Design a protein with these regions (language model features):
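A short acidic/small-residue loop/turn micro-motif
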Residues: 133-135
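N-terminal intrinsically disordered, cationic/polar leader segments
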Residues: 1-114, 118-120, 124-126, 138-141
Length: 141
């Protein structure tokens, strides 16, 4: 059975002039030709529950899957507008992502993934996002 390896991630997102940087512990594992990185989202407040995010990094496609209090799925493939969804205790909606850039550079369990996309909620443009995900295998793993 393959081992989950501890990694550190740095997630940098830019949207509407706002920069958000998160540095989080995570775990990574290769399954087939894809790298899976799992981490727990920081809780927004005392009433918020846990949400675990899995990032599936393929050769030319990226998928974000969230489970827990928030459930969502987004898929990113260069030049493609792909469907997704968002569900929380407070709201549900269908969305899609139109990926303008996707750059995947991996070396084993470490690497950088950068992508930009336009988000559509119910087919209405909702915003432009630029994301950078750095993955670094923990020393001594």
């Amino acid at each position: 059975m393959p081992q989950h390896t501890p990694v550190r991630i740095r997630l940098h997102s830019r949207h509407d002039g706002e920069n958000v940087v998160q540095e989080l512990p995570a775990e990574a594992i290769f399954r087939g030709s894809s790298l899976y990185v799992r981490y727990e989202d920081p809780q927004e407040g005392p009433q918020s529950g846990k949400t675990r995010t899995t990032v599936k990094i393929g050769k030319d496609e990226l998928k974000l899957i969230r489970h827990g209090d928030i459930q969502s799925e987004q898929t990113f493939k260069l030049g493609s507008k792909l469907p997704g969804f968002y569900r929380s205790p407070y709201m549900n909606f269908m969305m899609s992502t139109d990926t303008g850039q996707l750059d995947i550079r991996l070396d084993g369990l470490s690497g950088i993934v950068e992508w930009t996309y336009d988000l559509y909620v119910y087919e209405e443009f909702s915003g432009h996002f630029e994301i950078s995900l750095s993955i670094q295998e923990e020393q001594g793993s």
